[in-house]
Amino acid sequence: LFVLSATSADAAVANALVDIIGSMFPIFKLNALRIFIFLILFATLGYINVKGIKEGMLVVKAITITKLIPLLLLVIFSWGEVTVDNLVINSIPTVEDLGKISLILFFAFQGAESGLSISGEVKNPSKNIPRGIFISVVGVLMLYILIQTVSQGVLGESLASYKENPLSVVANEVFGPIGFTILTIGAAISMLGNLSSEILSIPRVLFRASKDKVLPLRSLSKINTRFSTPYMAIIAYATSGFLLASFGGFQQMAVISSASILLVYLGVTLSVIKLKRNEAKRTTNEFRIPGGYLIPILSLIIIVWLLSNLERKEVMGFGAYIVLLTIIYFLKDKIWKKE
């Protein structure tokens, strides 16, 4: 489920990236050309990461710095163009609409758990990783709120009309055509950074799962003798992302990604409740969630509510996928013995 969430998230981001390019150059809205761009995108990022983690990290660091600058400049300089009347809430969505919107919106907040894949290289991970995740989520939340506020304040009700590239339209209102171009490029770089970081980290989860015989695919644990990288896992992951991006749109992939990771979070939440019962046995140096059972129970309620907004065909699809994974899990030992 975690890998499905990551691959479908990459597919969603890839679609959003091409949508943004298409807002400037309509020719990129052609389906054949979109698929070709997906191929180049995933093949290039896969190749960079096969060559080595150093090259992959350099790309991630450079893109991370580059993508934040336009967003911060937009937030800082847009306040003078904000109209207070545009921030007034004139109508409240129904509970059903709010649930469907929240399921897609949740897509923007996932990914913090990726830091767990490198927890073995972090000093005192049981304490520092949870704190790091909390700080990063709060920081991202504040940035999202500021961006939404200035966007709504500048564009008002017309914001809903710009689904493909809204921030660039805001920048156009504030800075003129040069602002539109810079934010469009910045948004594309931001999405490219997301893809590059995912293709850097998630294949190593597949590699470890195969090596530990959690996945019945021995080939995923192969290491490239020249670059010392899990090349088969990287190729498999990049190929999966390309196929999902080619056959699904942004909204469809975002919902699949959100629902998949919510199911993972559901399991984690239930585990936290169980661990709370044995809290007295834990060492004092570990991070502890304050409030007793309050936070995990609230999380459980919210997750169930979000998942309840899935359509029937999506529920059936996830049910079939979970059944398939369960069968593979119970057969994996026999498969490994045959290999």
Description of each model-found segment:
Residues 217-223, 269-288, 336-338:
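Alpha-helical transmembrane segments
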Residues 18, 32-81, 92-94, 133-136, ...:
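Membrane-interface loop-to-helix entry segments
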Residues 74, 260-261, 274, 289-339:
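A generic transmembrane alpha-helix motif of multi-pass inner-membrane proteins
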Residues 28-33, 62-184:
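Helix-loop-helix junctions that connect adjacent transmembrane segments
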Residues 19-27, 134-196, 215-252, 256-257:
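TM-loop-TM module centered on a large, flexible mid-protein loop between adjacent transmembrane helices
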Residues 1-42, 46-50, 55, 187-208, ...:
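Hydrophobic transmembrane alpha-helices that form the core helical bundles
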Residues 14, 48-54, 83, 178-179, ...:
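Transmembrane helix-loop junctions in multi-pass membrane proteins
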Residues 24, 43-47, 75, 148-150, ...:
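Alpha-helical transmembrane segments of multipass membrane proteins
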